[in-house]
Amino acid sequence: MPTIQQLVRKGRETLVEKGKSPALDACPQRRGVCVRVYTTTPKKPNSAMRKVARVRLTNGKEVNSYIPGEGHNLQEHSIVLVRGGRVKDLPGVRYHIVRGTLDTAGVNGRTQRRSKYGAKRPKPGQAAAAAKGKKK
């Protein structure tokens, strides 16, 4: 434990908090190019094939980004918008790709939480028909 005199001379060093999405450089989103699009398996209790893309951002950094929603159209040189937000059961995936922007298409047939997945609002007659088709 330091003496009062030592604290007067040196003071306490403040701890610097590490950010949750450092590759974005304090920006809300960043544009990037897909370097590799692949699937990976989650951590122990869960089981799935999660869709992930390795993205080179405009600031030169490369990050692993999760592709949300069912189905996607991303390939190797697709241009995408990346936002922060980790995937709890995928180690090393700390970013999400924004659906419905740049080269990323929105999720087809999505009726709820559409804004999160870049889906357009269905026309009044089509919503009922799509719901009936899903039930069968």
Curated annotation (Swiss-Prot):
A single GO molecular function term of this UniProt record: rRNA binding
Keyword hit for Cytoplasm: no
Superkingdom to which the source organism belongs: Bacteria
Residues bearing the modification 3-methylthioaspartic acid: D89
Pfam families from the UniProt entry: Ribosom_S12_S23
UniProt KW Nucleotidyltransferase keyword: no
Keyword terms of this UniProt record: Methylation, Ribonucleoprotein, Ribosomal protein, RNA-binding, rRNA-binding, tRNA-binding
Compositionally biased residues, Basic residues: 111-123
GO biological process: translation
Feature: compositional bias, Low complexity: 124-136
InterPro entries the record matches: NA-bd_OB-fold (IPR012340), Ribosomal_uS12 (IPR006032), Ribosomal_uS12_bac (IPR005679)
Segments of this protein annotated with the region Disordered: 104-136
GO CC entries: small ribosomal subunit
UniProt-listed HAMAP family: Ribosomal_uS12_B
Listed NCBIfam families: rpsL_bact
Family designation: Belongs to the universal ribosomal protein uS12 family.
Assembly and binders: Part of the 30S ribosomal subunit. Contacts proteins S8 and S17. May interact with IF1 in the 30S initiation complex.
Function of the molecule: With S4 and S5 plays an important role in translational accuracy.
Protein name: Small ribosomal subunit protein uS12
Species this chain originates from: Parabacteroides distasonis (strain ATCC 8503 / DSM 20701 / CIP 104284 / JCM 5825 / NCTC 11152)
